């Protein structure tokens, strides 16, 4: 077994790195596919089969996470936000733009339009991640320069102010459960 920390070795474009990337991609696709299959089985009245799809999906999700960790793809929240923003940027500036052009050239105009629309959504995702990253980097996640509405995600209590309370005054849960609605 290769241990965590061999990221520099993987970065040399070894076959093992390619295998890890393929394993991550395959397991990631499988977890989504089995979730979709579970919905169909449940809708058709096959609850036991739906549960097996859901259970297998959870297994595949763990496998994907395991391979992603080996690739050292999980960092701090700030690193993860930056990586997510970069990924979303690639999707809207390159990937979906190219997909739309190809679909258009091949006569799939409706699909080309969907690619463009999803590209616009990916742009919004990038902007959201970059704003969140800025908040993390400037310690502005739980404190703002202007008055905000803060909501306890547990009980729904609302607080208005520049800073989220350290503890919800209603349910006593800590700051991590309070966010802007």
Language-model regions, residue ranges each:
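Single conserved hydrophobic/aromatic residue that forms the stacking wall/gate
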Residues: 1-10, 177-181
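Short domain-boundary/entry signatures in modular proteins, especially
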Residues: 73-77
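Inter-helical turn/loop segments and adjacent helix faces that build the functional surface
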Residues: 43-46, 101-111, 136-139
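Cys/His-clustered metal-coordination modules, chiefly Zn-binding fingers
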Residues: 120-179
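Active-site cofactor/substrate anionic-group-binding motifs, chiefly glycine-
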Residues: 70
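Alpha-helical bundle segments that constitute or directly flank the non-heme di-iron/ferroxidase center
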Residues: 13-44, 52-66, 79-105
């Amino acid at each position: 077994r290769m241990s965590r920390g061999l990221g520099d070795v993987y970065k040399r474009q070894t076959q093992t790195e390619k295998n890890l990337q393929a394993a991550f991609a395959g397991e990631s696709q499988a977890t989504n596919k089995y979730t979709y299959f579970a919905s169909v089985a449940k809708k058709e009245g096959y609850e036991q089969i739906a549960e097996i799809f859901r259970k297998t999906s959870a297994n595949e999700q763990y496998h994907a996470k395991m391979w992603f960790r080996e690739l050292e793809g999980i960092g701090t929240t700030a690193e993860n936000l930056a990586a997510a923003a970069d990924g979303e940027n690639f999707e809207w500036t390159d990937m979906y733009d190219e997909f739309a052009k190809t679909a258009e050239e091949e006569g799939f105009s409706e699909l080309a339009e969907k690619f463009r629309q999803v590209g616009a959504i990916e742009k919004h995702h990038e902007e959201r991640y970059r704003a969140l990253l800025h908040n993390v980097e400037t310690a502005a996640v739980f404190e703002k320069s202007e008055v905000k509405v803060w909501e306890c995600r547990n009980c729904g209590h609302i607080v208005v102010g520049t800073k989220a309370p350290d503890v919800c005054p209603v349910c006593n849960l800590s700051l991590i459960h309070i966010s802007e609605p």
